[in-house]
Regions:
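Alpha/beta-hydrolase superfamily serine-hydrolase fold, recognizing
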Residues: 1-216
Length: 216
């Protein structure tokens, strides 16, 4: 429920918004989260038109771990090998573009997150699985499978480097994307536009996000 304000502001921009719920680690693995997202996407496909939506213009927006999750689910949708490695059946709801806010894209770096998270996300023996190579979000197959993406971070976002590095991977692959990086401001912390959606800068984030998404 914490993102209700952010979702409401997107609604005011003319979007039909569904807020997806999914199970959380350590009660499940990331593959279970993929299944939850795809189940929600199937629900959207079945109900969006009767709810007043347009299935020819579908977008996914996520922050922090949610941004990571929709990055992977989008790639899984568009690459059968990744789907098979994950052991999931993707939704066939076409996603036109992504909005990635302060994404926690990297889960296995040699840092505070990567030191403990992988075994909970992927299982203790994940290095011996076919999904192992996709744990790195810069995997060329994964990058190539992504829809156009709008990314935002800020100087005071503790995961800023994740967005900066991931954007460079998109740039190297010549993938359609746009990056917004807010300057130093103690109010503009991790995923500020979701946690504090009524800040002026949060309004600017939503305006820029909407402008980008509507191109696709």
């Amino acid at each position: 429920e914490f993102n209700r304000g952010f979702c409401a502001l997107l609604c005011k921009k003319g979007f039909l918004v569904y807020s997806m719920e999914y199970r959380l680690v350590p009660d499940c693995k990331i593959f279970d989260q993929f299944r939850d997202v795809f189940s929600a996407m199937n629900f959207v496909k079945e109900h969006a038109v009767e709810d007043g939506g347009d299935l020819s213009h579908v977008y996914m927006v996520g922050d922090s771990g949610g941004a990571c999750l929709i990055t992977y689910t989008n790639a899984i949708q568009n690459n059968r090998k990744i789907a098979q490695a994950a052991g999931v059946r993707p939704s066939n709801l076409k996603v036109n573009a992504l909005g990635l806010i302060s994404g926690m894209f990297y889960t296995a770096k040699f840092d505070k997150i990567g030191m403990f998270l992988p075994k909970y996300l992927y299982g203790k023996n994940y290095k011996n699985t076919s999904f192992c190579k996709y744990v790195n979000p810069e995997n060329p197959e994964l990058i190539e499978a992504l829809a156009p993406a709008w990314l935002v971070t800020s100087h005071d976002d503790y995961l800023r480097n994740y967005t900066i590095h991931f954007e460079k991977a998109l740039e190297r692959a010549m993938k359609e994307h746009e990056l917004v990086d807010f300057p130093k401001n103690k109010k503009l912390t991790h995923a500020f536009s979701v946690f504090e959606p009524f800040l002026p800068e949060s309004g600017a984030v939503i305006d820029m996000l909407v402008k980008y998404l509507r191109q696709f």
